[in-house]
Amino acid sequence: MPPRAKKSLGQNFLKDRNIAARIAAQLHIGPDDWVIEIGPGPGALTRHIHAAGPARLFLLEKDHHWAREHRLHPLAGTPEAQVVLTDALLFPWERLDAAHPWKVIGNLPYNVASPLMWDICSRAPGLLRASFMIQKEVGERIVAAPGSRQYGALSVWLQCFTKPEWCFVVPPHVFTPRPKVDSAVLAFTPRTDRPDAVQSKRLARVLRLCFQQRRKQLQGILRPHVGGDASALLAGLGIDPAARPETLSPERFIALGEAVAMSAIA
């Protein structure tokens, strides 16, 4: 009998083969792709990923039991998968350079999904596509439009770096143990105009400032952090100084991050 899912690792194992096949299909795997699966567990997704015929397959597994199982007893037809015992939150995603076409997939634990997507989508320069199953509520935040209740820092960040695509909803009964909420599958295609390393740091800072006080006006939020008149800075960008953070588009946040950084050192 396989071990029980570990609550400490946020494990909910997918048991529906049709759903697993649909998730793997969202990655659009080709024969030249190098694929990373996060948290393969018993291998529900792994089978379908391998069947798609990628050039290389890497399994990132934090659970010692499942890492050992994949090494000692690889799934039928998957002997060349490379198993890496690691925490995906600590993985050096910046090493996924453009020398290879990288694609990343996973049924992400609810408790670490947001920081994982934040890092992967912004730090992996060679990323071609990603497909993740996450909590439905988090998925709704990611694709939320400016001005909506769900729109926040995660929405802006991921929309600056990728084009998120809502794929489909996954009900609780296809997992063991059964979660209390619905899941959703989203796919991510990197933008060609995504922020560079310097812009990323500035964007992260301004998002942190703004969404920690999302109900305040932007001029009030930024006043302690700019070298001059916050209202004038915002007006110069075509932004209403009385606007609140959730009304700005991702593109406006990139511009605001640059302006705030320049103002602070002027």
Curated annotation (Swiss-Prot):
Which top EC class is given?
transferase
Compartment(s) of residence: Cytoplasm
Mainly localized where?
cytoplasm
Q: What EC identifiers does the entry list?
A: 2.1.1.182
Q: Which domain of life is it from?
A: Bacteria
Residues annotated for S-adenosyl-L-methionine binding in this entry: 12, 14, 39, 61, 87, 107
> Could you tell me the keywords of this UniProt record?
Cytoplasm, Methyltransferase, RNA-binding, rRNA processing, S-adenosyl-L-methionine, Transferase
Q: Which GO terms describe its molecular function?
A: 16S rRNA (adenine(1518)-N(6)/adenine(1519)-N(6))-dimethyltransferase activity; RNA binding
Q: What protein family is recorded? A: Belongs to the class I-like SAM-binding methyltransferase superfamily. rRNA adenine N(6)-methyltransferase family. RsmA subfamily.
Report the protein's function: Specifically dimethylates two adjacent adenosines (A1518 and A1519) in the loop of a conserved hairpin near the 3'-end of 16S rRNA in the 30S particle. May play a critical role in biogenesis of 30S subunits.
Name of protein: Ribosomal RNA small subunit methyltransferase A
